[in-house]
Regions:
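Short glycine-rich phosphate-binding loop at a beta-alpha junction
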Residues: 5-12
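Short, well-ordered alpha-helical microsegments
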Residues: 16-21
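Long, charge-rich intrinsically disordered scaffolds of nucleic-acid metabolism proteins
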Residues: 36-155
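Short, solvent-exposed helix-loop connector elements
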Residues: 71-84, 111-114, 206-209, 239-256
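Phosphate-backbone recognition surface of nucleic-acid-processing proteins
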Residues: 158-159, 165, 169-247, 251
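Conserved small/polar residues in nucleotide/adenosyl-binding loops
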Residues: 263-269
Length: 269
């Protein structure tokens, strides 16, 4: 059989699927990467788990739900490079915050001589991490600047109130330059900011709520952008926030609406 007649279905495990993606591309074989939760909850009650059983469940899922197949399209080289660099940058940013916290949390409880030695070592680590972060940021900016589409998208994103470089960059990466999602609602669901109704059974009197099945990193970034809007003195989104609060809306609900508006504004542009 020709390789093009084969379809490989696998769970999408983020960066760990990269070797499989490369292998399928090299032999020109079609690849379907599915959300692990989608496979899990469509397989009924499960007992026991190992690689052999998991492989069988994935094969059964692919056989039963062939109408849901979505062939994997590899992102552009620029997007892949940005993804890898952003993962590395985020790792260093987390470590940097950790070491900065360690600089002062024990200051009043340690012998002065011991604290000075600790501080000296910490400062060295902090400087190295900051240098690495700056180098990665410069490389990412170079990639964006050399790609007309990405540069234009970055410019449009940063023209929106509350959206800075980090938020704009992560939106571009997560949406793969606005090619991954068909409409803003799908991205809002992915980011965990789209409200859903819960009106059946014991939940029939519940208010609309967001789902916890979300990309928590992009949700956090959108939240920070929305909160920054509330601290602005003026602007279209600030006016929207003030108007809804004056109408008696819950502030957190309005902030969640701002999270959605930030992306729908992006998509509209």
């Amino acid at each position: 059989m020709d390789n093009e007649q084969f379809l490989i279905c696998a769970e999408h495990t983020g960066q760990y699927t990269f070797p499989l993606v490369c292998a399928c591309k090299s032999v020109e074989c079609k690849l379907w990467l599915e959300n692990p939760s989608q496979i899990k909850y469509s397989s009924g009650m499960q007992r026991g788990k190992n690689d052999k059983v998991d492989a069988k469940r994935i094969a059964i899922y692919a056989s039963r739900f062939g109408d849901k197949v979505k062939y994997y399209d590899r992102p552009t080289e620029e997007i892949e490079r940005l993804k890898q660099l952003e993962r590395e940058r985020a790792l260093y940013v987390t470590d940097l915050a950790k070491y900065k916290g360690q600089m002062y949390d024990q200051k009043d409880f340690m012998p002065a001589a011991l604290y000075r030695k600790k501080t000296k070592r910490m400062k060295g680590l902090i400087q190295e991490l900051q240098a690495a972060i700056d180098a990665i940021t410069a490389e990412m900016e170079k990639i964006i600047g050399s790609t007309e589409v990405l540069a234009r998208q970055m410019e449009l994103l940063m023209s929106i109130d509350g959206v800075g470089k980090v938020v704009a960059l992560n939106v571009i990466i997560e949406t793969e330059a606005f090619s991954r999602f068909d409409n803003p609602r799908k991205f809002c669901c992915h980011a965990g900011v789209a409200p859903f109704s819960y009106t059946s059974g014991s939940s029939q009197h519940s208010k609309n709520k967001v789902s916890h099945r979300a990309n928590k990193n992009i949700k956090k970034l959108l939240h920070m952008a929305a909160v920054s809007v509330t601290h602005r003195k003026e602007g279209e989104l600030k006016a929207y926030y003030m108007r809804k609060v004056e109408e008696g809306k819950n502030k957190m609900s309005v902030i969640n609406a701002l999270r959605c508006l930030l992306y729908t504004s992006d998509a509209a542009d």
